[in-house]
Amino acid sequence: MLSQFPGQCSNNVFCFPPIESETKNGKKASWIICVQVMQHNTILPITDEMFSTDVKDAVAEIFTKFFVEEGAVRISKTTRVTEGKNLGKKNATTVVHQAFKDALSKYNRHARQKRGAHTNRGMIPPMLVKYFNIIPKTFFEEETDPIVHGKRNGVRAVACQQGDGSILLYSRTEKEFLGLDNIKKELKQLYLFIDVRVYLDGELYLHRKPLQWIAGQANAKADSSELHFYVFDCFWSDQLQMPSNKRQQLLTNIFKQKEDLTFIHQVENFSVKNEDEALRLKTQFIKEGYEGAIVRNANGPYEPGYNNYHSPHLAKLKPLLDAEFILVDYTQGKKGKDLGAILWVCELPNKKRFVVTPKHLTYADRYALFQKLTPALFKKHLYGKELTVEYAELSPKTGIPLQARAVGFREPINVLEII
């Protein structure tokens, strides 16, 4: 239970993270709220057992510390907690548990005041997946097993509470969702019981509904929505290095604070010891109607997707789709080693074009092909041919295949013999 509260113990005293502000003179001020457990004038070590069973003759004390840069530390009078609440009921608390809940409430209230009614946190882009249908071996070389959960084919969303107490719900591209009041209402209730600084990362989703329908619901400005918010991660802007397994523990504790939510859910996690176990879970998730699976490096930090950065601590597993498309042109890559390497250009029935990477050609072959293939040779031997393309999914906005790779031509063609 101790791990559900932000902060840490030092010399048997638990201190919440400092809440910092600036004085009128421009100096940094810090406010810290602490909890200690006393028994006959002795400070006891705080244990998880104290959250379920009272210690004889023990009382909990709450106090605050305040200091300004280069100034002395001022310590408040202690507030003593001598008994829990709701005794005899299912939601009864012990002395220690009640003291921590009281301290968290004061901590959150102070944090809101110091942020100010008009001070809003910036949007932090969510962490993006780097690996597709590949699980790095390093994931299994850590002390803690990788984490796997079902991949829902929904709309990515991040939630946080603003300085005025309102809920900000925004997309992967940092666009605010203006509707979804059903979800925001429950988020506001949840934030009454948890650290107000935490960001919740997940997907807007309704099971077995197509992505296009979900996207339409997510972007609607209407107050009502059928969508649910499935949360699979959490993070703090000043603690991005916190490992994934620790974040998952905190996320579980967050959802324990309010268990009567209807539209917000924690995504279930599974630990795996090898790739075969991860692949079996992926197969099971697909049978249940999900898109596939996400694999997380248990010790990986939270790496925001600034500038479309894709984190090497995430992998996505999902079945590939394939179809035939008409080849109409060719081009080259735009940067790095892809510059000068041939790419195929295919066309959809609606005349929209998209680029396809040859899957079975080496870079040396792709360089040679782009250098030697002329428009005349292309028109004579390749234009209008059906190209088999495997891809992850169709874009809900354009219908274009995403992560498209050319497997080969429907009729046997050796493109290297053309040049």
Curated annotation (Swiss-Prot):
It comes from the Viruses. One of its GO terms (biological process) is DNA repair. Residues 121-317 are annotated as: AD domain. It is found in: Virion. GO terms for molecular function: ATP binding; DNA ligase (ATP) activity; metal ion binding. PROSITE patterns: DNA_LIGASE_A1, DNA_LIGASE_A2, DNA_LIGASE_A3. The record marks N153, L211, L402, Q403 as: Important for the catalytic efficiency. It holds the Pfam family DNA_ligase_A_M. Very low-fidelity DNA ligase that seals nicks in double-stranded DNA during DNA repair. Together with the viral repair DNA polymerase X, fills the single nucleotide gaps generated by the AP endonuclease. It is not essential for viral replication and recombination. Displays a very low adenylation activity towards DNA with 3'-dideoxy- or 3'-amino-terminated nicks compared to regular nick DNA. Consistent with its intracellular location, ASFV encodes its own replicative DNA polymerase and three base excision repair enzymes: a class II AP endonuclease, the repair polymerase Pol X, and an ATP-dependent DNA ligase. This is DNA ligase. It comes from African swine fever virus (isolate Tick/Malawi/Lil 20-1/1983). The lineage of its organism: Viruses, Varidnaviria, Bamfordvirae, Nucleocytoviricota, Pokkesviricetes.
